[in-house]
Amino acid sequence: MKQKNYHSCTVGQIVAGNFDTTKVFSRYHIDFCCHGNTPFAEACRNRGIDPEAVAHELNELQENTVSNAPDFTGWPIDLLIDYVLKIHHRGIRAKGPQIEALLTKVTEAHSKNHPELLQVQALFRYSLLDLENHLSKEENVLFPYVYEMFQAKEEGLKVAKFHCGTILYPIEVMEDEHNHEGERFEKISSLTNGFTAPEDACASFRLVLQQLKQFEEALHEHIHLENNIIFPRALELEKKEAI
C-alpha cells in the first residue's frame, strides 16, 4: 500500500480521514480536537516527537487495521449535527451527573489519602456547568441556522442573514469554549496520572477514573467533529449563501 504523506495535512484533517488515527495521537498526547488545525509536523515537534516516527505509525495503522470508525467526512452536515446532538449532547447530560455522583462518593472516602480528588471533583463539576451552557447555545442559536442553510441549499432557496451578521462569531465562541474544556480535562488527566488508579484504590475509585477517561474520549470526538468538520462546512455553506 502506498505510504501517505501527512506533512501537508493538519492533525484534524488526518483524524477526519480516519478516526482510528486518534489512537496514535492520543498516545503521544497530540491534541487533534481543540488544536486540530495545527500542521502535522508542527504538532509533533510541539510535543518533542519526530514527525517521521509518528507518520510511520500512522501508515502502519492504516495498513494493518480494518477500521470500524464511521467515515464522518462522507456524512452530510445535517446528519453530523444529528449525531452530535443525539450521541454527544445526550451523552453528556446522561452520563455527566452519574459520574459526578460517583466522584463525590469516592472523594468523600479517599480525599484524605488522595487530596487531588478535591481538585478533580471541582474541575468536573464546573465542566458540567459550563458544558450545559455551551450545549444550549449550540442547540438554540448555531445549529438551527445551520440546519436552515442546509435545507435551503437542498431546495435551491435562500435564507435570511444570520441575526448577528455571520455564524463566524458564535463559532469562534464555541471554539474558545472547546479550548477551555480541553485544558480543563488536561488538568484532570494530569491530577489522576492519566486516569490511572493508585494501588490503594477501591472498585468505585477505579470505576470513576475509567468513566472520566471515557467521558474525555467522547468529548474529544465531539470537539473534533465540530471544530474540524461541522464548523468549516457551516462557514462554507454561509459563504455560498452570500453569492
Report the location of each language-model feature.
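Small-residue-biased structural context
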Residues: 1-243
